[in-house]
């Protein structure tokens, strides 16, 4: 009432009587909330039958920051699914049958970096080291298989070796924008 009127006179501006911008719940806000919910429900290969509703699908070998990157993208309003790539057989049939169903991007990394990350993961979980999971030769094979799979389906790839989640997401958004232009 009087306080708003006083400020209005002091600032020589008419009061709008609307909540400030930081509290406005607009379409953008609801879009982000929907994207976050979608992304959480489609993390780590879940609900693949709904994969066609994704704006972006991330595929990658274990420990390539698929989940944190997906969550970051969701906070920007992109409905993101992520699928672990164990081998080509782990790709959902719907994606193999229609590889351009939406913007699909492969995430890859250097094998030695993956060994280090996986060993740290095993240590942090206090699990005995799974030699298959942390073996350099096995990981080299896994990374090469992933690269070949991405190439086979003509999916763009991003090497996440020395990239932060934010940098990876920025690259993904650029690819997505190009994809939408060509769509």
What do the PLM-derived regions correspond to, one by one?
Residues 80-91:
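Short beta-strand-centered segment that lines the nucleotide-binding/catalytic pocket of NTP-utilizing
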């Amino acid at each position: 009432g009087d306080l708003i009127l006083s400020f209005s006179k002091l600032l020589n501006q008419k009061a709008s009587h609307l909540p400030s911008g930081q509290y406005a719940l607009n379409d953008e806000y609801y879009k982000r909330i929907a994207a976050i919910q979608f992304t959480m429900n489609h993390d780590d290969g879940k609900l693949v039958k709904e994969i066609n509703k994704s704006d972006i699908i991330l595929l990658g070998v274990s420990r390539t920051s698929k989940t944190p990157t997906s969550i970051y993208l969701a906070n920007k309003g992109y409905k993101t699914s992520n699928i672990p790539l164990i081998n080509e057989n782990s790709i959902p049939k719907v994606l193999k049958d229609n590889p351009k169903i939406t913007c699909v991007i492969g995430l890859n990394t250097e094998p030695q970096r993956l060994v280090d990350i996986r060993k740290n993961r095993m240590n942090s979980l206090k699990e005995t080291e799974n030699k298959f999971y942390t073996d350099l030769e096995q990981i080299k094979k896994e990374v090469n298989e992933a690269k070949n799979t991405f190439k086979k389906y003509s999916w763009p790839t991003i090497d996440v070796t020395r990239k932060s989640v934010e940098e990876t997401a920025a690259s993904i958004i650029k690819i997505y924008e190009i994809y939408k232009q060509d769509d």
